[in-house]
Swiss-Prot record:
The gene is serS. The lineage of its organism: Bacteria, Bacillati, Bacillota, Clostridia, Eubacteriales. It catalyses: tRNA(Ser) + L-serine + ATP = L-seryl-tRNA(Ser) + AMP + diphosphate + H(+); tRNA(Sec) + L-serine + ATP = L-seryl-tRNA(Sec) + AMP + diphosphate + H(+). GO terms for cellular component: cytoplasm. This is Serine--tRNA ligase. Disulfide bonds: none annotated. Belongs to the class-II aminoacyl-tRNA synthetase family. Type-1 seryl-tRNA synthetase subfamily. GO terms for molecular function: ATP binding; catalytic activity, acting on a protein; serine-tRNA ligase activity; transferase activity. It is found in: Cytoplasm. InterPro entries: aa-tRNA-synt_IIb, aa-tRNA-synth_II, aa-tRNA-synth_II/BPL/LPL, Ser-tRNA-ligase_type_1, Ser-tRNA-synth_1_N, SerRS_1_N_sf, SerRS_core, tRNA-bd_arm. It comes from Acetivibrio thermocellus (strain ATCC 27405 / DSM 1237 / JCM 9322 / NBRC 103400 / NCIMB 10682 / NRRL B-4536 / VPI 7372) (Clostridium thermocellum). Its EC number is 6.1.1.11. Catalyzes the attachment of serine to tRNA(Ser). Is also able to aminoacylate tRNA(Sec) with serine, to form the misacylated tRNA L-seryl-tRNA(Sec), which will be further converted into selenocysteinyl-tRNA(Sec). PROSITE patterns: AA_TRNA_LIGASE_II.
Length: 423
């Protein structure tokens, strides 16, 4: 959520940001509603002042033996007007808040211009794509041939875009989770949490999934619960309506969770295999920082996610997301994309974002620099560290052998009891 004071004092900032995003939101309409609220508050304050004056005059006049009937009538009228204006202010506040919840974040000045993912800017690459002396198979075919992935049985049990991991497939997924958590906790200094997989509506509003993207969420019918689309939601909301001590910042959490996404607009895009599932596993990195350090912390967070792929020895690249591809909540975002041989292109495995105070303002997460200092909103950041299903997919594709077997990355072998080849 954006600060209405910022919009009021410098509406051109928002207008330019929305123009970059090609968003036709009516800024002038918002300002008119805000002005109406402010005028109503002034009128309300004047009526309350008059009410207070009269409340002092009535006992004085009574003591002096004066007639107070007209004052009593005026007090009754004032009370009715105040009640009506109070209700009007509450109604305007609700309307303003509902509107503010639909406005996207203002992109950072360094975000590249562009309309789609084709305009994202490559920042760096790591590793060289492997040259195969045979035609590489797609990961779903490799997994089915090795009997470690079963899409047809999952479709029978649940539906399309679900998977059974079996045998060494399940163990590989679990090995990835343990490896990533160990790396981020032991080397990168994150504190692990294991969050609930269900959250209520206010939590989804706090991190920006609602109200705008409700169609992409799985809601539990007849309740106010939603299945989480990412651990970002419960972990960020751990600090809802809380004032943190500046000495505790940055707070760094890592969390494993299952993630659930309807992906309503994703039909036909990478829907075969493990790339775009309705349910998938992910290790998430979440940070709470001061405003002045958040972009430095974004670089560190991105490097932490990259190290997962370096240790797995998977070729990847980092791209800075252009304004047309930037998510609703992010001020700046990097995508980390892994090389997928069967696709002959890079595929996203992690998004690392700085939301500045956009989420903190929605969720009421603040910090205080000193005992008598006014609380300020923290900056929140998060990134996949990384998506486990996509990591499994890129391991199967990049480490496949001509005989159909798959070599296990060296760093995972200790988590698989020394197994070096899946065959």
């Amino acid at each position: 959520m954006l600060d209405i004071k910022l919009i009021r004092s410098n509406p051109e900032i928002l207008k330019k940001a929305l123009q970059k995003r090609k968003d036709n939101f009516d800024v002038n309409g918002l300002l008119s509603l805000d002005e109406k609220r402010r005028k109503t508050l002034v009128e309300l304050e004047q009526l309350r002042n008059k009410q207070n004056e009269n409340s002092k005059l009535i006992p004085k006049y009574k003591k002096e033996g004066k007639d107070v009937s007209s004052l009593m009538e005026e007090m009754k009228s004032l009370s009715e007007k105040i009640k009506a204006l109070d209700a009007e202010v509450r109604k305007i506040d609700e309307e303003l808040n509902a509107i503010l919840l639909t406005i996207p974040n203002i992109p950072h000045e360094s975000v590249p211009m562009g309309d789609s993912d084709e305009d994202n800017v490559e920042v760096r690459r790591w590793g060289e794509p492997r040259k195969f002396d045979f035609t590489p198979k797609p990961h779903w075919e490799i997994g089915e041939n090795l009997d470690i992935l079963d899409f047809s049985k999952a479709a029978k049990v649940t539906g399309a875009r679900f998977t059974f991991y079996k045998g060494l497939g399940a163990r590989l997924e679990r090995a990835l989770m343990n490896f990533m958590l160990d790396l981020h906790v032991d080397k990168h200094g994150y504190v692990e949490v294991f969050p609930p997989f269900l959250v209520h509506r206010n939590s989804m509003i706090g991190t920006g999934q609602l109200p705008k993207f409700e169609e992409d969420a799985f809601k539990v019918s007849d309740t106010d619960y939603f299945l989480i689309p990412t651990a970002e939601v419960p972990v960020t909301n751990m600090y809802r309506e809380q004032i943190l001590d500046v000495k505790d910042l940055p707070i760094k959490h890592v969390a494993y969770s299952a993630c659930f996404r309807a992906e309503a607009g994703a039909a036909g895009r990478d829907t075969r295999g493990l790339i775009r599932q309705h349910q998938f596993n992910k290790v998430e990195l979440v940070k709470f920082t001061t405003p002045e350090t958040s972009y430095e912390e974004l670089e560190k967070l991105t490097r932490d996610a990259e190290e997962v792929l370096q240790m797995l020895e998977i070729p990847y690249r980092v791209v800075k997301i252009c304004v047309g591809d930037l998510g609703f909540t992010a001020a700046m975002k990097y995508d980390i994309e892994v090389w997928m041989p069967s696709y002959n292109r890079y595929v996203e495995i992690s998004s690392c974002s700085n939301f500045e105070d956009f989420q903190a303002r929605r969720a009421g997460i603040k910090f205080r620099r000193g005992l008598n200092e006014k609380p300020e909103f923290v900056h929140t950041l998060n990134g996949s560290g990384v998506a486990m299903g996509r990591a499994t997919a890129c391991i199967l594709e990049n480490y496949q052998q001509e005989d159909g077997s798959v070599v296990v990355p060296k760093v995972l072998r200790e988590y698989l009891g020394g197994i070096s080849v899946i065959k």
